[in-house]
Amino acid sequence: MITSKDRSIVRELAKQVRDRAELPIMEARRALWYQHNDLKTTRPIIATFPEVAWHEIIPPESLQCENEEFRFMETILRGKLFRADVIRDDVPIERTWEVTKIITDDGFVKDGKGHASVANNPDYRDNCLGGINYLWLHSYKFNPNAGHFDPIIKEYEDLDLIKTPEVTYHEKESMEKLAIHQDALGDILDVQFRGQKWLYFAMMETYTNLRGLQEVMEEIYEEPEMLEDGMERFAQAYHELLDQYVKYDLLDLNNDQSYSGSGGLNYTHDLPKYPGGAKDTRNFWGFCESQEFTMVGPEQHWQFVMKHEAKMAERFGLFSYGCCEPADKKLKYILTIPGIRRISVSPWADVEVCAEQIKDKAVYSWKPMPSTFINSFDAMEPLVRRMLEATKKHGCCPEIVLKDTGTCNNDPASYGRFTELCRRLIEEYYG
């Protein structure tokens, strides 16, 4: 049931978001992102994504709406206002309000077998092509306890369980959702109906979730043929999964405020490149990462995983690579990925080595250590300085992406202090 109270709450919040979006600073931030992603400026850009810590910023008990769909709207709207008023980073507030088509699939394993979550979370369902919200919702539940893991793929013949997910578009439910959002917000914000925009291909993560991380590491030496075969099958399945999204017109162009790779935004004038719009994946950003291969050498990383990721990248106009895995020892391969435009420089990567090799060939997407931000804020300044010195010396196009903060120690204002720190240092180094 939708009450007048719920409707009044989200409409008032939407008006505040609209007002923030129309501020001149937001247009300046959009222009900065376009220059940044098009590799036309070396001035660092700042983007913060609190992720799990959104639970502390907007606690579920603080929400005023009662209807579940309106609680979703309220959460997103309050998140946008928090970004504009407290974080104050370079992420612009847009007047657009996207309603995403409801799309599901039946997974990569025959007979419906599979783990809903290796994190032992019954409320989490992995979208096989990837999906990301503006913020982590109040309804997400995470069990911090360890859970027993029983691999589905135990023997070589179990690879025959792998299949291509079959996609289903729930049009009726999607249109009903669109109508609710349009009715509530359509005269205030620009409500847009959108398909999949964040295109994420987690080949090794998918295999590891079914095989087990220790088992995969052992396979490298004991059964490399099995690992090669398994990755060939998952690569083919991901290609066929993407084909379905194209065939059923379930994609929407992502050269806008869409989340990019493992952090950042997709604003660019370099896309779209070809006629056909969303029917041609060459007009999109794509994204791959292989965190599970962090401790594996560059040659084997290429042999077992990255060659498949590079093949996937051929289908896209621009590509992001990496997440938490350190890139410094693998850049000779990463830089050969077709269309590479954003490279994750994780907290464990050597910032100097990465700066020397990346230069202005791609966006240098630096992720400061979130545990330092959480536990020792005063230690953040030397980390930021070290990155700024390295990237300025080598003429990089850097961005500072604070993410993976599992908590903010119930101090939401700390995100604003981090932005202030970064702005002060950027001004010192760049003027």
Each language-model region and where it sits:
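Polar low-complexity intrinsically disordered regions enriched in Ser/Thr and small residues
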Residues: 115-117, 133-134, 264-267
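A gly/proline- and charged-residue-enriched helix-loop-helix capping module
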Residues: 138-179
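Compositionally biased, low-complexity repeat tracts
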Residues: 110, 126-127, 143, 208
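Active-site loop segments of alpha/beta catalytic cores
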Residues: 1-51, 57-73, 79-83, 90-93, ...
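A generic structural signal for solvent-exposed, polar alpha-helical segments
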Residues: 39, 103, 114, 140-142, ...
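N-terminal accessory alpha/beta regions
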Residues: 85, 92-118
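Aromatic-residue-lined binding/catalytic grooves and analogous aromatic/hydrophobic interfacial grooves
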Residues: 119-129, 134-136
